[in-house]
Every structure is written in C-alpha cells, then in structure tokens.
Amino acid sequence: MNHALNIDARNGNAPRIDETTPRALPSLAGMTREELRLVAIDCGVEEKKAKMRAEQLWRWIYHYGVTSFDEMTNISKDLRAVIADKYALHRPKLIDRQVSVDGTRKYLIELAPGVECETVFIPDVARSGALCVSSQVGCTLNCTFCHTGTQALVRNLTAAEIVAQVMIARDDLDEWPTSNENRKITNIVFMGMGEPLYNLDHVATSIDIISDGEGIAISRRRTTVSTSGVVPKIEELGARTGTMLAISLHATNDTLRDELVPLNKKYPLVELMNAIRAYPGLGNSKRVTFEYVMLKGVNDSLAEAKALVKLLKGIPAKINLIPFNPWPKSPYECSDWDQIEAFADVVNKAGYASPIRTPRGRDIFAACGQLRSESQKVKASVLRKQRLADGASPQA
C-alpha cells in the first residue's frame, strides 16, 4: 500500500520558497499521531510497526521536548539518520521576548517570512500560569476596543503553529519533560490574536495535541476558547473539543454591542445567548466565562451591571471584569476603579463571581486587547506570481 504525507497541504498558507534558497525540512513538532505514523512509513518502517514508532516519536517531541534526533535513544541510529535526512524538529523562529515588571512574558514568533504572531505567558501568584495563544495573524472582527482589530487578517494559523507557541514558551520556561509538579503553564487560553472559531479545524486539532496525556498534557478542562460570538460554531466547538467556553461580551444591548463588537450585527445577542445555553456539558462545574471590558462612560454604569445580571439569568457563568488596557490612538479610557468595584458589587450580589482582572504586562503591551503584529496580508496576485516563478500551477 502506498502512503504519502502531504506536508504542503498542512501548510497551504505558507509562502513558496525561491529555488535558490535551500528548502527547509518539514518539522515533526506540531504533527498529529497519524501524521507521525505516516512519517515512520515514509522512512521505511513496516506498516505494522509504524504506530509503535509514532508513539516513540510522540513522547520524545511532546513529553521531552527534544530538538535533536540524537536524543531519541530508544530509536535505532539507522532509523534516526533516515528521519533526520527528511525531517527536522525545529520550532518557528522566536524573534523577540519581553518580560514585564510583573513577570508576564510576551513572545513575538515568526511563522514565515513577514508573518508573525504574539503569545503571552501570564504567571499566577500561586505555582500556576496561563499561556495566551493566537489562532490567527490579524483579525477580521474590528472590535473597536481591541488593538488586534486594527490589524487586517493575514491568515489562519495551522495546528502546528498553534502548538508551536506552547512549545516555545515551555522551552523558555524550562518545562521539559512534562511533569505534574511545579508546572508554570497550567492553563491554555485562546485569547490572543484572532477569532478561534473562524479557524476551528486547526484550533481543534491543536487542542487534541496539547491535551494528550502522553505529551504536553494540559487538559481540556484547563483550556478555554474565547469567541466574540460566532454563533453557528459554538456548539460544534464544545462537541469537538470539550473545552471551557469564554464569550467576549462587553455590552448588554445590541445597539452598544453593534458598535463595540461589529460581529453582533450578524449574530445579535438573542442568538448568541441561545447558542451559549446549548453548549455541551454546560453546568455548575462547567461555567461560561463572560469577558466584559470596562470602558469609562460607555458600558460601566450600574444600570449596565443590572442589565448584565438580567441577560445572564439561568446561565452558569462567571464574569471577568477587565480594566481597559490602552494602546496607541485607542478611542477609549479605562473606567475609574471605584466604578469598576461598584459594578462588580452589583454582579456579585446577584450571585455571580465577578473577579476584576488585574492588568498584567501593560508595560510591554502584552495585556488583554493590546496584541498586534506588523504582518501584512500578501495579495493573492502576488502569491500566484510566486507560485509561477517556482514552476508550480497558479492554482496550487
């Protein structure tokens, strides 16, 4: 039986490489179990033994985080040499790493020439922390309070590129091999650049890899996917991933939400709330997190707090109140702290947990709503010319 691993199909958005440039070997880091099985077959392993070899590769890549085939000591030297001739173990390039005064770390990662995303590690006061990952470069939603919304969508990230963000952070934090003791990254939040539900296939595959107990092993219950309200995909997200759900809400009526989150014009609040109520597994042990950015004089009145309580009636939920994090030329100001506390008091008295999120990483523009890269979308006509220059079909 013939088997072919189509690496180009996995990275269909990646730009073509000029023929004069040595072609980079495809990396095993970010591949699924099935893809690793096909790699084994491609390297001459008998089909009946390929699953076992894939398991070995998986453990070395995702449990131990190795970056050299020489470290894979339970795989024969001959097989390692064959694999190393065809594949690599590299991560995407880490361009910049900034550390905030509060310990927050921001990583600028180059996925391809001119294509960059940002990832943020947020340490907790206890021995835990969350890694905020991106699912797209840029965004299409144009939320008016979010810096990423000022950057046009460049492209979706592949599952491998999402997983790579976790691996790069673990490299930096010295978190290999995987251990249940003294972990720094205990939670994954899809709250970085982009709308995850507009890239659900790759997001779901990345969660399968990240949550696997024999690898990185960050469970689905410790993974939260945030959406601005892509209603048709919410139930599918729950069915496919089993993760926690967060909603980027920010307003309690359609008029204001249309302004803050323009996606609301397509999927208004009544449709959004119905989709949330249908989320698989919803209950007191699996509450929805509602994110509410506090904008001075815009959505922070006590009347809005009461309207929020009414809107969420009957939904197991907690509300994260997020002090607005400014960015250059942003049109909003953060609510006064006394007003935020008064707002939280109304929500708390109604029986909802409503923690006020402590701003983290503001000094390095790593806080909520501040992420943005300088990547720009390459026009389709330019990509076609690149493909023709490489001798490929313009439709490739």
Curated annotation (Swiss-Prot):
The keyword Hydrolase does not apply. GO terms for cellular component: cytoplasm. Binds 1 [4Fe-4S] cluster. The cluster is coordinated with 3 cysteines and an exchangeable S-adenosyl-L-methionine. It is found in: Cytoplasm. InterPro entries: Aldolase_TIM, Methyltransferase_A, RlmN_N, RNA_MTrfase_RlmN, rRNA_lsu_MTrfase_RlmN/Cfr, rSAM. One of its GO terms (molecular function) is metal ion binding. The active site is at 118 (proton acceptor), 368 (s-methylcysteine intermediate). The keyword Transport does not apply. Its main location: cytoplasm. It is an enzyme of class 2 (transferase). Its cofactor is [4Fe-4S] cluster. It catalyses: adenosine(2503) in 23S rRNA + 2 reduced [2Fe-2S]-[ferredoxin] + 2 S-adenosyl-L-methionine = 2-methyladenosine(2503) in 23S rRNA + 5'-deoxyadenosine + L-methionine + 2 oxidized [2Fe-2S]-[ferredoxin] + S-adenosyl-L-homocysteine; adenosine(37) in tRNA + 2 reduced [2Fe-2S]-[ferredoxin] + 2 S-adenosyl-L-methionine = 2-methyladenosine(37) in tRNA + 5'-deoxyadenosine + L-methionine + 2 oxidized [2Fe-2S]-[ferredoxin] + S-adenosyl-L-homocysteine. Its EC number is 2.1.1.192. Disulfide bonds join 132-368. Keywords: 4Fe-4S, Cytoplasm, Disulfide bond, Iron, Iron-sulfur, Metal-binding, Methyltransferase, rRNA processing, S-adenosyl-L-methionine, Transferase, tRNA processing. HAMAP family: RNA_methyltr_RlmN (MF_01849). Belongs to the radical SAM superfamily. RlmN family. Reaction proceeds by a ping-pong mechanism involving intermediate methylation of a conserved cysteine residue. This is Dual-specificity RNA methyltransferase RlmN. It comes from Maricaulis maris (strain MCS10). The lineage of its organism: Bacteria, Pseudomonadati, Pseudomonadota, Alphaproteobacteria, Maricaulales.
